[in-house]
């Protein structure tokens, strides 16, 4: 259910805007059934990735600070995760895989690039912010997980010849 809850109006607005911008074209291309499967695989892959990264980070913290965890003073594994952003990032990479040369233009700053380059930039930014811990409160590895699972599913469908069959 985490994919249907959001942290506020702007979180919901930007996810729905991206869902409309990129998801509608993706759905028209692969069909509604595959699109629904794609959306949930990317979303569930996002939370799986986020949970695994958090688990391993917790393990590293436990080794460094074993006394903190044993006394129950901290419990990071109960950090809530919410939003459809992981699935949305999966949709963005799916769109970029099917339409790599489409041009995306940002409003601020006014930059135009091909979809494949925007997605690559998103990956680098999410990886950097996730590893360095900048922009706290954002599940960067969930975004990357959504992209990874979306990429792998679309790659599987392409290679198996199932992408274009509705």
Place the predicted regions along the sequence by residue.
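A detector for small-residue-rich transmembrane helices and their helix-helix packing motifs
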Residues: 1-166
């Amino acid at each position: 259910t985490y994919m249907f809850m959001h942290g506020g109006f702007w979180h919901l607005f930007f996810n729905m805007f991206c869902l409309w911008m990129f998801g509608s074209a993706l759905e028209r291309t692969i069909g509604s059934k595959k699109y629904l499967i794609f959306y949930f695989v990317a979303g569930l892959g996002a939370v799986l990735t986020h949970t695994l990264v958090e688990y391993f980070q917790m393990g590293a913290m436990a080794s460094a600070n074993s006394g903190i965890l044993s006394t129950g003073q901290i419990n990071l594994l109960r950090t809530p995760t919410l939003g459809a952003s992981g699935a949305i990032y999966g949709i963005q990479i799916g769109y970029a895989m099917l339409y790599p040369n489409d041009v995306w233009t940002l409003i601020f700053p006014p930059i135009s690039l091909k979809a494949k380059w925007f997605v690559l930039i998103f990956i680098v930014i999410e990886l950097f912010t996730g590893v360095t811990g900048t922009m706290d409160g954002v599940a960067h590895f969930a975004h990357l997980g959504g992209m990874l699972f979306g990429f792998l599913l679309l790659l599987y469908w392409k290679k198996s010849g199932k992408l274009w069959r509705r």
